[in-house]
Amino acid sequence: MAEAHAEKHHDYHLVNPSPWPVFGAICAFLTAVGGIVWMRSMGGGEGLFGLRGPGLFAVGFLGILFTMLMWWRDVIKEAHGGDHTPVVQLHLRYGMILFIASEVMFFVAWFWAYFDASLFPAGIHPLEITTPDGATEATKQMIGMVERNALTGGHWPPKPSANFHGTFDPWGLPLVNTLILLTSGTTVTWAHHALLQGDRRGLKWGLLITIVLGVLFTACQAYEYVHAGFKYAGHIYGATFFMATGFHGAHVIIGTLFLTVCFFRALAGHFTPKQHFGFEAAAWYWHFVDVVWLFLFACIYVIGAGTPLAH
C-alpha cells in the first residue's frame, strides 16, 4: 500500500518552506513607510530604525529586489525539477493574470486622483455634499475641496509661477520615451516568436534589445525628472505627476530586471517552444507596462499639457 501510494501521480507538488513571502512583506512595509516619511518631509522626519525617509525607502526597495531574485531562483529550480506540471503551469498563468489585474487597479487609483484634481481644480465639486445642518464648507474641507483651490490657484495645470515653471512639451522627450517603449514591445514579441520557432539567436537578441530599451527609457525618465519645472511638493499637479509616472518608472525597472533574468536563462539554455512560462510572464508584464505608459502619455502629457516648460 505504501509503495502504491508513493507511485501515485499528483498534479500538484508541495512547495518547500520559503522565507521569501515573509521577508518580502517586511521589505514592502519598509518601502511604504520610507516612502511616506520621505514624501511628507522631503528627506527629513524622524525615520525608523535610525534611518530617515530616503534611506528607509532604499533599504526596503533593495530588499524587494533581492526577494524577487531569490524567489525566482527557487521557482526556476522547481521548474527544472519537474514540479511544474501542466496543471501547475495553468494556475501560474491564472496567478500572473490576477497579479496584472491588481496592478491595473493600482494605476486606476492614480488616474482617478489625477482626473479628480484636473477636472475640479477650483475646489468646486458637482455634488454638493451637505449634512442635515447644512455644513457644506466643513464637508468640502473634509474631502479636500477648500485646500485644493489654494494649491492649484483654480487652474489646471497651475499657471506659471516661482514654484511652477510649466509642464513638459509632450512632443519632445515624452514622445521619444513613448517610441522607445513601443519599440521594446515589438522586440519582446520578436523574442517570443523566435522562441516558438526554435530560433535561440533571435530569442537572445530580442531580449537583449528590449533590456537596453528599458534602461534607455529609465535614463530618459530620470533626465526628465531632473529638468522638471516643478517639484513633488507644493501643489497637486506635481504630486499626481510624480506619483503616477514614478510608479510606472518603478514598474519599468522591475520589468527590465524580469527580462534580464530571462535573458541569462536563455544564455544558459533554458526555455523550450513548449515550456517557457517564465519568459511568457515577463512578456505579459512588459506589454502591461507599455499600455500603462500610453495612457499616461495621452492623459498627463498631452491632455494636461498646459503651458510647456521653456528650455
Where in the sequence are the language-model features?
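...captures the hydrophobic TM-helix bundle architecture rather than a specific catalytic motif
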Residues: 1-311
